[in-house]
Amino acid sequence: LMSCDMAVFVTPLYYYNVSSQLKHVIDRFYSFTGELTARRLKTAFIVAAWDDNDWTMEVVETYYKTLCRYMSFSDQGAVYGTGCGSAAMTRRSAHMREAYELGRSLK
């Protein structure tokens, strides 16, 4: 993480937040917060959820934005994939195109 150009955090949505696996990785940042914050690392965020309610991603979106603010990450974009509970659902959604466009926009 200290030598990469960018980090992309990808997770399924579990009870309106990131998975425990991703949370564990983020919690490990604590031991080198100062060094990581000084890097102003570029980041992106991709989340997939079965639900497609308009409020489904509110908590996880706030979590990611707060993490970026606290860690001085440079947010390059996010894909909040609601209605993506299976591969077929995801293919029918607009979120595949959103992820593609996010990737194309990165410099």
Task: Please annotate each region the language model reported.
Residues 1-71:
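Helix-loop-strand module that forms the ligand-binding subsite of alpha/beta enzymes
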Residues 65-107:
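Glycine-rich phosphate/pyrophosphate-binding loop and the adjoining helix
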